């Protein structure tokens, strides 16, 4: 008979290891039971099935770890194989719901987050498309102990940032991209899943602590895949990531691009000179975006050049969207929302002064949740409706097509713009365009307005 939540640490390890190479169906066959007899077919994912049939844990929302008194939480989580052969987490690891009304009263080591998640028994399974969940196999297990993790200090910093925002009455402004590894992801069916917060009358979206998808991807590659060639930014230091960045700014702020190139021994005609400069600032040989910390936190480094008149050359765009895919999504789970809510940018700011670009500092930025849930949502929904209704082309004047896609003048944050090499670089449409009858149309993508980007750097103008 299964002990359920009463297994001790050694027993949990033995059972976890025994599950490797098995699917849920394999486990069910060993138990001589069928899913139909034990579980409603409409309830639970693979994780709940493993909890129930491997350990005998019934589905619950208990505030305690799954195994008491061992103090171990059980998490069953998927990873996938990318086209290039690399491994990636399929999703974030959702932990416990954030109790806005009480969590702020605690210190990190006495918090409900720590109590619930300081020791997690991870069971990884390989997700494969077009395969029934019950046939997916558990491939690896790992007892993840936060107290022993090299990321503990950063995770504590992330927790403190989330709590600071709650204490400031800004729980409604929380975004998963605010932090590095430990995020605050939305937890609810839709935007109407609102909760009271203690220091503001504005209700906030229900959120849960989570390990970000980018962080889980690095754990997958570390414990399952090949992680031998990943370079670290934080080498031989006890500093947090933010402390390290401040040291970089203090060291190089005020130096011209030419002075930095001379200091790092770089030629002015070298390709990707800006990428090489920012890598040297961080004392790494590889691309900064490919280092461990940047991949874990999903940080995109980008050089920003401000002209003497305040003009900013750089723009921010996203990969082209497939018309046939965008109409299959809804706003709450669309690719653009996911990207903006989980991505942080690290801007290296250079300003033109007396004919030379001078390094002014580093700005970590992610799009505020209020902008995502208003302007971006409006733009995305109009794009969705335009494609689905077949009303892409508005008019044709002198052979030039004008579309119904959102332009820069219509939205204060973002717009839609062509992304193809030329008019012949197209994607299939889900329904023919009504005006032209076309079944394909030029590739388009989402862009962040240059005027919006300029506001991000007002302190440097």
Describe the function of each predicted region.
Residues 1-461:
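Nucleic-acid endonuclease domains
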């Amino acid at each position: 008979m299964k002990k359920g939540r009463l297994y001790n640490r050694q027993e949990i390890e033995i059972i976890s290891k025994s599950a490797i190479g098995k699917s849920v169906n394999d486990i069910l066959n060993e138990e001589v039971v069928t899913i139909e007899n034990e579980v409603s077919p409409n309830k639970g994912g693979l994780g709940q099935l493993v909890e129930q049939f491997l350990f005998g844990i019934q589905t619950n929302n208990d505030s305690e770890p799954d195994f008491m008194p061992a103090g171990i939480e059980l998490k069953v989580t998927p990873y996938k194989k990318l086209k290039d052969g690399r491994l990636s987490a399929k999703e974030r690891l959702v932990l416990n719901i954030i109790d806005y009304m009480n969590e702020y009263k605690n210190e990190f080591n006495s918090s409900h987050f720590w109590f619930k998640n300081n020791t997690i028994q991870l069971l990884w399974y390989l997700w494969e498309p077009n395969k029934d969940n019950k046939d997916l196999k558990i491939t690896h297990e790992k007892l993840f102990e936060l107290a022993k993790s090299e990321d503990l200090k950063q995770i504590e910093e992330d927790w403190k940032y989330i709590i600071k925002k709650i204490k400031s009455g800004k729980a409604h402004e929380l975004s998963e991209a605010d932090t590095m590894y430990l995020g605050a992801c939305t937890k609810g069916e839709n935007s109407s899943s609102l909760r009271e917060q203690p220091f503001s009358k504005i209700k906030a979206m229900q959120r849960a602590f989570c390990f970000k998808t980018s962080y889980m991807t690095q754990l997958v590659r570390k414990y399952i895949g090949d992680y031998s060639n990943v370079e670290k930014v934080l080498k031989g230091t006890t500093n947090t990531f933010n402390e390290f960045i401040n040291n970089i700014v203090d060291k190089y702020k005020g130096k011209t691009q030419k002075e930095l190139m001379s200091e790092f021994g770089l030629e002015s005609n070298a390709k990707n000179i800006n990428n090489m400069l920012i890598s040297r600032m961080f004392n790494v040989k590889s691309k900064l975006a490919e280092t461990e910390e940047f991949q874990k936190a999903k940080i995109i480094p980008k050089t920003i050049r401000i002209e003497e008149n305040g003009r900013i050359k750089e723009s921010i765009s996203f990969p082209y969207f497939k018309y046939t895919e965008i109409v299959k999504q809804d706003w709450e789970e669309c690719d653009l929302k996911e990207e903006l809510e989980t991505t942080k940018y690290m801007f290296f700011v250079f300003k033109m002064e007396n004919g030379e670009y001078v390094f002014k500092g580093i700005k970590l930025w992610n799009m505020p949740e209020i902008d995502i849930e208003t302007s971006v949502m409006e733009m995305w929904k109009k794009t969705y409706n335009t494609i689905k209704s077949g009303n892409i082309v508005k008019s044709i004047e002198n052979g030039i097509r004008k579309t119904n896609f959102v332009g820069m003048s219509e939205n204060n944050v973002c717009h839609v713009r062509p992304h193809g090499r030329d008019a012949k670089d197209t994607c299939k449409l889900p329904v023919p365009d009504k005006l032209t009858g076309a079944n394909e149309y030029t590739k388009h993508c989402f862009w962040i307005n240059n005027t919006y980007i300029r506001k991000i750097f007002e302190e440097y103008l």
